[in-house]
Amino acid sequence: ALENFFPPLQGWLLRNVGAYSVVRGTMDLPCFRCTRRLLAAGEHPVVIFPEGEIVGQNDVIGAFQPGVAQFAFWALDELRAASQGPLPPVYAAPVTMKYLLPGDVRPALARRMALMERKLNLTDPRTDLYDRLGKIGEAVLAIAEREYGLTPAPGGLFNDRVQAAKAAILARVAREVNVTLRPDRTTIDHVRMLFNAVDRITRAAPAPTAYARKLQREHQRRVSALYVDLWRVLRFAAAFDGYNPDRLTQERLMELTNRLEWEVLGSLRWVGPMTAVVHVGEPINLTAYYDEYRRDRQAALAMATHRLAAAIQEKLTELNARMTPLAALTPAGAP
């Protein structure tokens, strides 16, 4: 996204490795044209992050966006217009990345949990790290419920309270930016939609008069505060959604600690060292979907996107077996 190019050193590095920016939430036509030209020329690969949003979970993928297939089909449109011959293949190579912890990071995680416990005035730390993390999560959720004016049902389940908190925060942001949330979309879809809406307001062209610009800046300052709410929803989703504690690994425990530490302390630190496993899968020829694309655009985009996502999730599931289950580690303090 464009904002990643603003820090001078980071922007310089991104430009010099061949990255170019996209303005989120807009029809960024210069970016789209550049991508089409690169793919049509076929001289350089284009790397695209298909989920479109950070989900903060190392062992599952988020919902893929159709942009990868769409760019390929746009490039094929250009190639078809330029030549009457057979269309060349346009390949998408599914790349899977998995981060693993080769050493025992429980002592480091325990120290970070202790810091969060002090910040939350939790004076009864547990010995089991997952139990301690659950207590921290409970305290964080209770504080968030008070701040957002939520009253949980008596005896309400923790996961139900998390879902209610996320829904309430998203509804609040949607009201502020005048966006209607669709009930058939996921939490991540709603977060992406609202990020885009906030981006459009905070990065709008200056108003034509001095007084209008003054009001615009005031509105932009109010709306900018909503970024905090949206990141909170993402942290809640990453920390609490879709994981079974019976199959807990130290990689997942580290991720849970990271998200809660980011929420409580406002910083995100990794423990290490870490090993990155990168797998480049069999390239998928998206030209094979082009005839279907010309007949039914949405169906072809859905089929191609599903195949790409399935290829990456299949490999990721295989790599998940290389994570270290907590049950397999020597109990803390044992010889």
Residue ranges of model-derived segments:
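Membrane-interfacial terminal anchoring regions of lipid-handling membrane enzymes
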Residues: 29-46, 56-66, 70, 74-335
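Short glycine-rich anion-binding loops that position phosphate/pyrophosphate groups of nucleotides
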Residues: 51-54
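Catalytic core of membrane glycerolipid acyltransferases/transacylases, capturing the structured
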Residues: 1-27, 81-86, 102
